[in-house]
């Protein structure tokens, strides 16, 4: 009887290992296929003109300069808006309101916002901002992206500060340090690697967002630093050019997709190299 049970358990173990391997292979297969397609079609489309010329008309030569400028401006502004708000909100949840009912409700609402479709956020900014000023703008796009950043940074900051040992807080408090100094000088220093990693990953997330920008920044064909009007950006250019019947536009769409992928990849590599998570 014992041998029968032993062989049965071995069979179940092999079956589960096989299913796990197939699941991993299934996921990696599609990832490798996507990367292979992106490399074979995107890398040949990269050129110096891509960074020096604005988006062209049909049948013309051009690049993505205006889209790169627009995306850079909106990502920078949204990061400057969303990061401080997210860090301060996460600090309140982890340090000041750790055991309050408000904190539990706030964490739940933050998780809801974290999983909300980005198109809903775009519609929200359109309703409260774009429809009031009667025109699309880079500011509206930056506000939408900032709302996407905030819950990511809140969750990361909250989690990282909760990992800081209470012994450090108690030791500082016993020396007479006020709570704000304990947070800034001890908790932030202990959790800074995780917090900065969360900020970088939130930037990587908004880099490819298209839906919220359709209702806020839209796009244009000009090189502009003015965020008070419609502003070109790489995700919208990819969306427009990929669906066009013109071969040169299709190539620019693949080049834009490659740029975003490389940017996200570099951010992830940077975060892992310079802000590694310490094992316990």
Swiss-Prot record:
GO terms for cellular component: plasma membrane. Its main location: membrane. It is found in: Cell inner membrane. Pfam families: BPD_transp_1. Residues 68-271 form the ABC transmembrane type-1 domain. CDD domains: TM_PBP2 (cd06261). Keywords: Cell inner membrane, Cell membrane, Membrane, Phosphate transport, Transmembrane, Transmembrane helix, Transport. The chain crosses the membrane at residues 19-39, 68-88, 108-128, 133-153, 195-215, 251-271. The keyword Cell inner membrane applies. GO terms for molecular function: phosphate transmembrane transporter activity. It is a multi-pass membrane protein. GO terms for biological process: phosphate ion transmembrane transport. Belongs to the binding-protein-dependent transport system permease family. CysTW subfamily. Part of a binding-protein-dependent transport system for phosphate; probably responsible for the translocation of the substrate across the membrane. This is Phosphate transport system permease protein PstA. It comes from Pasteurella multocida (strain Pm70).
């Amino acid at each position: 009887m014992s041998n029968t049970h032993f062989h049965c358990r071995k069979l179940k173990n092999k079956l589960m290992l096989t299913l796990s391997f197939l699941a991993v292979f299934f996921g990696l297969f599609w990832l490798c296929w996507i990367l292979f397609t992106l490399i074979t079609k995107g890398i040949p489309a990269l050129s110096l003109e891509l960074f020096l010329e604005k988006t062209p008309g049909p049948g013309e030569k051009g690049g993505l300069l205006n889209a790169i400028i627009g995306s850079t401006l909106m990502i920078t502004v949204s990061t400057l808006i969303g990061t401080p708000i997210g860090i301060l909100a996460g600090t309140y949840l982890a340090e000041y309101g750790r055991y309050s009912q408000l904190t539990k409700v706030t964490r739940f609402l933050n998780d809801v916002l974290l999983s909300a479709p980005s198109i809903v956020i775009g519609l929200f900014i359109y309703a409260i901002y774009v429809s009031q000023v009667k025109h699309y703008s880079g500011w509206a796009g930056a506000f939408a992206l900032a709302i996407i950043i905030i819950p990511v940074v809140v969750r990361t900051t909250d989690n990282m500060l909760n990992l800081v040992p209470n012994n450090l807080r108690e030791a500082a408090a016993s020396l007479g340090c006020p709570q704000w100094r304990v947070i800034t000088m001890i908790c932030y220093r202990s959790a800074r690697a995780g917090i900065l990693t969360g900020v970088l990953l939130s930037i990587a997330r908004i880099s490819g967002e298209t839906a919220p920008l359709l209702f806020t920044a839209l796009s244009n064909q000009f090189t502009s630093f003015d965020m008070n009007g419609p502003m070109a950006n790489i995700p919208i250019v990819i969306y427009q050019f990929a669906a066009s019947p013109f071969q040169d536009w299709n190539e620019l769409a693949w080049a834009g997709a490659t740029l975003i992928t490389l940017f996200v990849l570099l951010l992830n590599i940077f975060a892992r190299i310079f802000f590694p998570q310490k094992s316990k």
